[in-house]
Regions:
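N-terminal beta1-alpha1-beta2 module of alpha/beta enzyme domains
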Residues: 2-99, 202
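An alpha-helical appendage that flanks or caps ligand/catalytic pockets
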Residues: 5-11, 16-46, 158-193, 234-356, ...
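Conserved, mostly hydrophobic/aromatic
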Residues: 15, 65, 77, 96, ...
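Hydrophobic faces of well-ordered beta-strands that scaffold small-molecule active sites
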Residues: 15-19, 73-75, 105-107, 135-139, ...
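Active-site mouth loops of central-metabolism enzymes
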Residues: 40-56, 110-118, 200-210, 264-267, ...
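Acidic (Asp/Glu)-rich catalytic clusters
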Residues: 63-67, 93-102, 124, 128-135, ...
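Glycine-rich, proline-tolerant flexible connector loops at the mouths of alpha/beta enzymes
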Residues: 74-92, 111, 229-232, 362-373
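Alpha-helix-loop-beta-strand connector modules within alpha/beta enzyme cores
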Residues: 86-107, 378-390
Length: 391
């Protein structure tokens, strides 16, 4: 494989907006009778009329982020999840493409291990054409719970992911028709009509939360690695693994190969931001509650990834370890809230310490008021982002 190095300034940082699009009406009392928040919590708690309002609010936030100066918008998908009303990242990306004009659209990402790769390739190519070449295609394995939901053995997840990745790239770069004799996705005839606008294909990013294997895989392919909210010390360890692997592959990685996601909110005063920011703890107690065999079934993660997971404190999405307090999460720069001046100072620290080329702002959670989120987006665009780009 020939890797084409990316080129970026050593100090330039791009800032992306992200929302899980939560169904923020769920409470601890709603969840209390159920063993698991994903496997057992029923959709009788879902109100389509309320969801209609929420979806339109989230789309308005996308449009506002585009207007005030965010470089991109990140989206994702999850299944059987009240904290993420996005069962299809491609549907959400289509909406983003129509309500925005300038921003890149980073899809982190398509769960290609559990879906038809040819259909994924066609849909992403279609989105790239609709958006005018603004798509960044992120590929993910899917969570362990989603693997179980799909009726697929967790031990096959990574192998399926790697085959699906190779097939998608072939669909984008090889004229059809052709055959694909894969173990998991055999096709006698493939002849995709729609191909991406970007050549040879849209940029590919790979996200992760702590698995060394994921970092190594991303580096071997020359793909930027996006760390989704691990603590800074672990994130720097993962970045070192990326650098070591990149050197083995013959290229020198820069900031353009690394991004970092953190929960972040800006308000007019520190006091107001602190109050609103506590909503980031909405999923702390119940997001992945349930039997360990649902959230971490045997074979889904390597022993090394499991060792790392068990040794670190919980920051909102884990199932093992000591849970951190709101104050500790802020001290660790995992949650950043405050006035523009406070947030600028904290993000400058992260930028200097981690040197990411991309900062991904997880800016909405639970039942945060739409007006507060819109104000946060505005303050990011008018105050915070310009300051980060001046450095």
């Amino acid at each position: 494989m020939t890797l084409v190095p990316l080129r970026r300034s050593q100090t330039l940082v791009d800032v992306y907006w992200f929302s899980e699009q939560p169904y923020g009406y769920v409470t601890e009392d709603d969840l209390a009778p159920y063993e698991s928040g994903r496997m057992h919590f029923p959709n009788t708690n879902f109100d389509p009329e309320k969801a209609h309002v929420l979806y339109n609010n989230y789309h308005e936030q996308y449009a506002w982020a585009d207007e005030v100066g965010f470089d991109g918008i990140m989206s994702n998908e999850h299944h059987s999840s009240y904290w993420c009303m996005k069962p299809s990242v491609n549907v959400d990306a289509a909406v983003i493409a129509k309500v925005t004009k300038k921003t890149k659209i980073a899809m982190l990402g398509n769960v290609i291990a559990l879906n038809d790769p040819v259909k994924m390739a066609e849909e992403i190519a279609m989105l790239d054409c609709i958006s005018g070449g603004r798509i960044i295609s992120g590929f993910v394995r899917g969570t362990a719970v989603e693997t179980l939901h799909a009726g697929i053995s967790p031990t096959e997840n990574r192998e399926r992911f790697e085959e699906a990745h190779d097939l998608i790239l072939k669909c984008w770069t090889t004229p059809g028709p052709f055959r694909w004799e894969g173990r998991h996705f055999p096709h006698r005839m493939i002849n995709p009509w729609v191909v991406p606008m970007q050549k040879p294909h849209p940029p590919v990013w790979f996200p992760g939360t702590g698995s060394p294997e994921s970092v190594i895989w991303a580096a071997k392919h020359g793909y930027p690695y996006m760390n989704l909210g691990s603590l800074l010390d672990l994130t720097k360890q993962l970045k070192s693994i990326y650098h070591e692997t990149a050197h083995e592959m013959g290229f020198e990685p820069g900031p353009e190969h690394f991004g970092y996601l953190m929960r972040c909110l800006v308000a007019d005063t520190d006091e107001k931001a602190q109050k609103i920011g506590r909503t980031f703890l909405w999923t702390e107690n119940h997001r992945n509650r349930g039997p360990i065999e649902f959230n971490d079934p045997p074979g889904y993660q390597s022993r090394e990834a499991m060792r790392i997971k068990m040794s670190r404190p919980l920051i909102g999405t884990g199932t093992m370890g000591r849970r951190m307090t709101y104050e500790e999460l802020q001290e660790a720069h995992n949650i950043v809230v405050g006035s523009p001046e406070t947030v600028i100072k904290k993000l400058r620290y992260v930028k200097k310490d981690l040197k990411p080329g991309y900062i991904l702002i997880y800016g909405n959670e639970g039942n945060m008021r739409h007006e507060d989120v819109m104000r946060s987006i505005e303050l990011f665009g008018t105050k915070v982002i310009p300051a980060l780009k001046e450095d």
